Design a protein with these regions (language model features):
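Catalytic strand-loop segment that frames the active site of acyl-thioester-processing enzymes
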Residues: 1-23
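Residues that recognize and position ribonucleotide moieties
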Residues: 21, 30, 50, 96
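Hydrophobic beta-strand-centered segment that forms part of the acyl-chain substrate-binding groove
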Residues: 23, 37-71, 76
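Amphipathic alpha-helical recognition patches that constitute DNA-binding helices
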Residues: 27
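Hydrophobic/basic alpha-helical segments enriched in Actinobacteria
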Residues: 2-5, 9, 45-47, 62, ...
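HotDog/MaoC-like acyl-thioester-processing domains
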Residues: 61-73, 77-108
């Protein structure tokens, strides 16, 4: 893992299906939120004992994830004193864009 970037993979399982073989949007949103949190905490200057929370989460669904694993890459756009602003891109492992997320995460 490098500072200000985190990449997480969500394997497709039947428990994530909403209709047919389509992955549920809530699972995709949760992946975006988790990847953003990991990237927010990836800076070496952040003490290990701090707590944090998601302040805002916007998800744009671009395509369905059909019976395939997906991967989210979160990148820090800006670090403020307490808030971290992040962009998260979700793709299938074959490279299809599935969703985009904009996250504000509060440290402390």
């Amino acid at each position: 893992m490098q500072p200000d970037v985190a990449t997480l993979t969500l394997p497709f399982t039947d428990s994530l299906i909403t209709i047919g073989t389509t992955m549920h949007g809530g699972a995709i949103a949760s992946l975006i939120d988790t990847a953003a949190m990991v990237a927010a905490w990836s800076d070496d200057s952040v003490p290990a004992d701090l707590r944090g929370t998601t302040v805002s989460l916007t998800v744009i669904y671009l395509a369905t994830a059909e019976h395939e694993d997906i991967q989210a890459t979160a990148r820090v756009l800006r670090r403020g004193r307490n808030l971290v602003y992040l962009d998260v891109e979700v793709q299938s492992l074959s490279g299809k864009s599935v969703a985009r997320g904009l996250v504000t995460y509060k440290l402390g």
